[in-house]
C-alpha cells in the first residue's frame, strides 16, 4: 500500500496558494500517477488517496462547520476516486469533529476509508483526544473506517505507546501505525530526521507484535527505512506484545510521563497545566 502525493490537496489548503479552484485537477492527476505506478509493480499494490486536515478550526473557536468540512473533503474524495484510488486515507487529523466530517465525506463519495490521527501533546492530539477516546469514537461512527490508528507525532516510541492504547480497548478493527523516522533536527541548513533504518525496523516489528495490521512510515521515512522495515517483518518471527519498558529500551524514551490514559491520566493533565503556568 502506498499513498498519493495529495496530502494538502483540499480547497482549504490549496487556497493558501490561490489554487482552490484546482482541487479536481490536481487530485485526479495525483491519483492517476499513483495508479500507473501500482499497476506496473508486478504484484498487488493498493493505492490510497492521501487526504490531510483542512487546517481550519471548528466552531465555536473557529469558523469551520461540519457541513463545510464535509464539502471540502468530499470534493477531494471525488477527484481521487475519479483518478483510480482504491481507498481514501485521511491522516494527521487532530479534532474529533474533523474525523467525523471525514467519515461523512467518505460515505457521500461511496468509498472505503482509513483514518489516522496525530498524537503529539503528552499522548494526545492537538485537540486533546486520547487513544482510548479515538477508539471509542471510531466505533460510534455511522460510517466507521475499515482501519484506524496513528501517524506522525513525535517519534516511534510515543506512537507505539499510542498503539498499545488502541489495543488495550479490545478493538477488533485493524490498527494502523505510521510513525516518523525519529525526531526532526535542524542541521547544516536543513531538517534531518534522526531515525535510522535499524530503528524503524525495530519499530515495525514491535508494531506487528502489538497487533498492528497496517505498518508504515511518516515524516523522514526514506526508501532505505522502508526496505529495512520490510526485511525485518519478513525475516523475524512474531513475538509477544511489547511492554512500555521494552519500547523505551529499543526506540528511546517517551516525550511525556503520561499518554492521558490509565492510572496516570490525571497526573499527566496536571503536569501539562503546570508547564503552561
Task: Please annotate each region the language model reported.
Residues 1-277:
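Domain-level signal for soluble alpha/beta catalytic cores
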Amino acid at each position: 500500500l502506498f499513498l498519493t502525493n495529495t496530502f494538502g490537496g483540499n480547497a482549504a489548503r490549496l487556497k493558501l496558494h490561490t489554487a482552490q479552484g484546482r482541487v479536481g485537477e490536481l487530485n485526479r492527476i495525483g491519483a492517476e500517477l499513483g495508479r500507473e505506478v501500482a499497476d506496473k509493480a508486478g504484484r498487488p499494490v493498493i493505492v490510497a488517496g492521501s487526504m490531510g486536515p483542512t487546517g481550519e478550526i471548528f466552531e465555536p473557536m473557529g469558523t469551520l462547520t461540519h457541513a463545510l468540512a464535509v464539502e471540502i473533503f468530499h470534493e477531494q474524495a471525488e477527484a481521487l476516486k475519479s483518478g483510480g484510488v482504491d481507498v481514501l486515507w485521511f491522516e494527521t487529523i487532530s479534532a474529533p469533529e474533523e474525523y467525523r466530517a471525514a467519515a461523512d465525506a467518505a460515505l457521500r463519495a461511496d468509498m472505503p476509508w482509513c483514518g489516522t490521527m496525530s498524537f503529539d501533546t503528552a499522548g494526545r492530539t492537538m485537540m486533546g483526544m486520547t487513544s482510548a477516546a479515538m477508539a471509542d469514537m471510531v466505533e460510534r461512527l455511522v460510517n466507521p473506517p475499515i482501519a484506524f490508528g496513528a501517524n506522525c507525532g513525535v517519534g516511534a516510541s510515543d506512537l507505539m505507546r499510542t498503539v498499545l492504547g488502541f489495543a488495550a480497548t479490545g478493538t477488533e478493527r485493524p490498527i494502523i501505525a505510521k510513525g516518523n523516522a525519529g525526531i526532526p533536527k535542524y542541521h547544516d541548513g536543513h531538517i534531518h530526521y534522526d531515525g535510522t533504518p535499524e530503528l524503524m525496523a525495530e519499530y515495525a516489528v514491535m508494531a506487528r507484535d502489538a497487533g498492528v495490521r497496517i505498518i508504515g512510515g511518516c515524516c523522514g521515512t526514506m526508501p532505505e527505512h522502508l526496505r529495512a522495515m520490510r526485511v525485518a517483518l519478513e525475516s523475524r518471527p512474531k513475538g509477544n506484545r511489547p511492554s512500555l519498558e521494552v519500547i523505551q529500551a529499543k526506540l528511546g524514551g517517551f516525550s511525556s510521563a503520561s499518554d492521558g490514559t490509565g492510572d496516570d491520566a490525571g497526573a499527566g493533565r496536571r503536569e501539562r497545566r503546570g508547564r503552561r503556568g
